Design a protein with these regions (language model features):
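ATP-hydrolysis module of ASCE/P-loop NTPase motor domains
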Residues: 30, 116-124, 202-203, 234-237, ...
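Interdomain "pre-motor" coupling segment immediately N-terminal to P-loop NTPase/helicase cores
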Residues: 478-540
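ASCE P-loop NTPase helicase motor core
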Residues: 472, 573-748
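Intrinsically disordered, flexible peripheral segments
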Residues: 1-326, 330, 341, 405, ...
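Short hinge/gating elements
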Residues: 92-110, 178-190, 456-461, 506-508, ...
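Conserved helicase motor core of P-loop NTPases
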Residues: 520, 532, 536-537, 543-549, ...
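N-terminal pre-P-loop "Q-motif" helix
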Residues: 553-571
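Long, intrinsically disordered, low-complexity tracts enriched in Ser/Thr with interspersed Pro
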Residues: 317, 323-426
Length: 949
């Protein structure tokens, strides 16, 4: 696991990393630290113990007689240097690794973790290191390849459980291509946090396998444990996480739904004070707890025998290093002096000095937080900072100010730098490491990696048109954390690009098929712009609409009239109507249906959901189906017509409601069917509304490219209250580019505030703990907000409540609010006091790729089969629509399922054609309102409909 935090105060940072432990003093803690990274190598400190003054100087941006930072002025007008200190990347090993490394002091397992951390840092240097440089007066991001990292290894959690974790404190500096130190652009690290975490998991899993241990993947996120450790063993030594989960649960919040701020608050609230234990006492307590769960010396000996057997079977490798202190030397594969040539597997060359002296030289600390201890007050080191004791020369240029000096092989030059700043005279320093050529790197791609990349691309392209490359990397590594490496995935993506299977654009990927689908759609719509005759003669359109206005007794809005005129008079097969919510699209469609029918056309409608299709038909009189059902029926009709030798069809107009929900695949299918049926299509919707869950934004694309003739409906008529209408007008106002200006949201909230429509719940700060800066108790604040909101809702009369909604972005809020509302309704006797417990099924919304991968399944999931089949082993027939429960996964890569009659069958997920659900418990009483999530045609129940019990 990886967590990322900013280091806030450089002066207090070392104290935090030194002193936040239980049985080491300051010097002991420093003895077990290490500088790492190519940047550290340039400075000549790579592999050396961290020294207080050097650490402080680098955190404060003093490096090789340069002072990094921005010149600012304080309230007294005095200049000072403002420099962001750095980032703390905390790599935490799985609990089974911590038990082996800390409780039983297995140095091979510990080394696997340390190597994984260093390999991950090297990967960050290779792919996720950026800086900003000035190019012709413009600040631009630039790739770099080196970091200066301080490594601190700790071994306990705040709850005194074994927890192997390493703080990798990344200094805010990198040596750029111009041989100048500049600050990091750390967005790339934060943006790729999940991928970096997966790289660490992958490195660690493969390192453990390389020393002879098996690992068991626990979920689809790539989390794993050493094989043999039971969930009970892991839980016993995970008290810290249990504390946080219970703290959230006591407030009705699931940790999976809790935002980061609430998790942090729970961590602070449950954080215990440090307790005084010596190392021997603590380890003895650990062993006693472990023994009670079956983690005996015999249990551990069996695992260590695997390691010894693996080492004896490994090819002998002469070692040039005495690895008595594995923390300080590490393994040769992590040495930055070695050029990176790519690797396809983790080296299994591990020293096996079973009787070697390897005292535990790691320090203990709690979970990551920002440094808050006392500052260091020693002299600054001259080893790295050069002339840092002098007042730094600075330039107030709104960018990093530099005092430059030349360094060769990490040692400062004594001769002064030439004053001529000509770029032609700049001689790049010799780097003490070989710079990586990413293009020429040779990596052997395993078959498993190819499967993983295929899975990742299939998964993401089902719902996104252009996928950030980092998403593919992360998902592919999680596919098989034991075998798939970061570099192999990159190599496979490069291969697929060269073979024109995928397309890369600005760091994003898509498939050639999807890209071709977009291009075809654009060209097809353009080709059909003069392909049909007008529905109504152009000279008669205005007269006919005037007549309709007289019949209605009111005029159309400008948007309604323009849309109708465009549809009736256009020669294009495809027309777009881009209309905001509340602009009268229903009225426009009613008129369209009436006039088109008079002119011999059949109007048909389609919508994304059953409820939407039902409402479209009820409100406009246009017969409508879901998009999926419409396409099925149209395909069947066209096949029947083709079979019967052709039948004359009446002219048709297809209305696609809420077109922003149409995926690229569906969009192309609709175009194809319309062309074959010689039908016209009106795409109706708002391109800025919610998009399709599937890949692509075709409705927006064809408008932005100008190929779809589109009319606009932006005249708000839904809001009758002028104050609310003013607010809506501000929200939907567009900028010069024709897009809604999100910055107007502030103005909209100001208007609502002036109208006294915003009610803020203020919770007084409680407690005086300086460490928490007297921050509000977020749990108490949220609870009071919930109660106030429910109170306001319940004060409405029943009719008003039936037409009101409480909206929240968090699932945990939804559960709590529903509980509070139900409690109040029972007090009013609007709900029966007797609850009945029901199991409900919640769709996992797995993609097709996810449904076919066994790691995504968990016990007690429910599978609904989309087609019938017979189990070959048992002869049991599973009918289409049957629901079966997942019991377990077997060693053959199949799921063991159980049906309603308790029959067991084995099923391979790769066969697909299923829906996957998770079960949840719900309390339901007479008077409750439920929402249906699956259509049942035989009972005329539609997806999305609501019913009262």
């Amino acid at each position: 696991m990886l967590s990322v935090n900013n280091v806030v105060e450089s002066g207090k940072a070392l104290s935090y990393y030194q002193l936040d432990n239980y049985y080491t003093n300051e010097q002991q803690s420093l003895d077990q630290t290490e500088w790492y990274g190519r940047g550290a190598q340039v400075l000549g400190i790579n592999g050396e113990q961290i020294e207080a003054n050097t650490f402080k100087d680098l955190l404060e941006g003093r490096v090789e007689d340069q002072q990094l930072g921005r010149v600012r002025k304080d309230e007294n007008g005095q200049s000072y240097i403002d420099h962001r200190a750095g980032i703390d990347l905390t790599f935490s090993a799985p609990k089974s690794v911590s038990i082996m490394a800390e409780v039983f002091e297995n140095q091979d397992v510990l080394q696997a973790h340390l190597d994984a951390v260093k390999d991950t840092i090297s990967a960050i240097e290779d792919h996720y290191t950026q800086t900003r440089i000035s190019v012709d007066g413009t600040i631009q991001k630039s790739e770099s390849d080196n970091l200066v990292v301080a490594l601190f290894n700790h071994n306990t959690s705040r709850a005194l459980d074994p927890q192997t974790h390493t703080h990798a404190v990344v200094m805010n500096m990198t040596l750029n291509d111009k041989d100048s130190w500049t600050a990091l652009s750390n967005e790339v690290i934060y943006d790729n946090q999940a991928t970096i975490g997966s790289i660490y998991n992958s490195n660690l899993a493969q390192n453990l396998r390389a020393i002879g241990l098996d690992v068991e993947v626990k979920d689809n996120q790539g989390n794993f444990e050493i094989a043999g450790f039971t969930p009970e063993m892991i839980q016993e030594f995970s008290q810290r996480r249990t504390q946080i989960i219970e703290s959230l649960k006591s407030r009705g919040i699931d940790i999976e739904d809790a935002p980061a701020s609430l998790r942090e608050q729970a961590a602070l609230k449950t954080r215990e004070r440090k307790q005084a234990f010596n190392e021997a006492e603590l380890r003895q307590v650990w062993k006693e707890r472990a023994s009670e769960l079956g983690i005996t010396q015999s249990f551990v000996d069996k695992l260590e025998d695997k390691i010894k057997t693996n080492q004896m079977n490994a090819d002998p490798q002469p070692s040039e290093k005495n690895q008595k202190d594995i923390w300080k030397t590490g393994s040769s594969k992590n040495d930055p002096n070695i050029s990176f040539e790519g690797k396809t597997e983790v080296s299994s060359d591990k020293s096996n000095n079973a009787d070697k002296e390897a005292p535990d030289k790691r320090i203990d600390n709690s979970e990551t937080q920002n440094p808050s201890d006392s500052a260091i007050s020693n002299e600054k080191a001259s080893q790295v900072s050069g002339k840092s004791q002098k007042e730094p020369e600075t330039q107030n240029m709104g960018q990093e100010a530099h005092i430059q000096d030349e360094v060769r092989l990490g040692k400062k030059q004594t001769e002064p730098k030439a004053s001529n700043n000509s770029k032609d005279q700049t001689v790049p320093r010799e780097r003490p490491y070989q710079r990586k050529n990413r293009e020429s790197q040779q990596v052997l791609i395993s078959q498993k990696t190819k499967e993983a990349v295929y899975y990742a691309i299939g998964h993401h392209t089902e719902r996104e048109m252009m996928i950030p490359e980092t998403k593919i990397l992360n998902t592919a590594m999680k596919f098989d954390i034991q075998e798939v490496t970061h570099e192999q995935v990159r190599a496979e993506l490069n291969r697929l690009e060269k073979e024109k299977i995928i397309v890369r654009v600005d760091g994003k990927l898509t498939t050639q098929r999807l890209a071709h689908s977009e291009v075809w759609s654009l060209q097809h719509i353009q080709n059909e712009q003069k392909s049909v005759s007008p529905i109504v003669d152009e000279s008669q359109v205005k007269t006919r609409l005037d007549q309709e206005e007289q019949l209605r007794g009111r005029k159309f809005t400008p948007g309604q009239r323009a849309s109708l005129e465009t549809i009736f008079s256009s020669e294009s097969r495809y027309i777009g109507v881009d209309g905001l919510a509340g602009t009268g699209k229903t009225t426009m469609l009613h008129t369209l249906n009436k006039v088109a029918s008079e002119n011999g056309f059949i109007v048909k409608g389609m919508a994304a959901t059953g409820v939407a299709a039902k409402n479209l038909e009820l409100e406009t009189g246009i017969p409508s189906k879901t998009m999926a059902m419409f396409q099925i029926k149209e395909n069947e009709l066209q096949k029947e017509i083709e079979k019967n030798g052709g039948v004359n069809r009446k002219n048709e107009i297809w209305i696609v409601d809420e077109s922003s929900f149409v995926s690229q695949t569906n969009f192309k299918d609709i175009l194809t069917l319309a062309k074959q049926a010689n039908s016209r299509v009106v795409f109706l919707g708002d391109k800025l509304q919610l998009q399709s869950i599937s890949a692509g934004k075709p409705f927006e694309l064809v408008q932005n490219r100008g190929v779809l003739k589109t009319s606009q409906m932006h005249d708000i008529i839904r809001q009758k209250n002028q104050e609310l209408k003013d607010v809506v007008s501000v929200v939907v106002a567009k900028n010069k580019e024709g897009k809604i200006d999100l910055s107007n949201n502030d103005k909209a909230f100001d208007l609502l505030d002036k109208q006294q429509r915003i009610h803020e719940v203020v919770v007084a700060a409680k407690g005086t703990q300086p460490a928490l800066h007297e921050q509000h108790d977020l749990f108490q604040e949220i609870h009071e907000v919930h109660q106030k909101l429910v109170g306001d809702y319940m004060r409405l009369n029943k009719e008003s409540r039936d037409n009101s909604l409480i909206i929240t972005p968090f699932n945990s809020d939804r559960v709590m609010l529903n509980s509070l509302v139900r409690s109040e309704m029972k007090k009013l006797n609007e709900l029966d006091h007797n609850d009945h417990n029901f199991e409900i099924l919640v769709n996992t919304n797995f993609t097709e790729a996810e449904r076919k991968h066994i790691n995504n399944y968990e016990p007690n999931m429910t599978i609904r089969f989309g087609k019938s089949f017979t189990d070959k082993d048992t002869g049991i027939k599973i009918e289409k629509g049957d629901y079966l429960k997942v019991m377990m996964k077997d060693k053959e890569g199949k799921l063991v399922l159980i049906d309603k009659d308790k029959n067991k069958i084995k099923w391979n997920p790769k066969k697909g054609s299923v829906e996957v659900y998770k079960s949840e418990q719900r309390k339901i009483a007479k008077g409750d309102v439920i929402r249906i999530t699956r259509t049942k045609d035989d009972e005329q129940i539609k997806n999305g409909e609501r019913y009262k019990i």
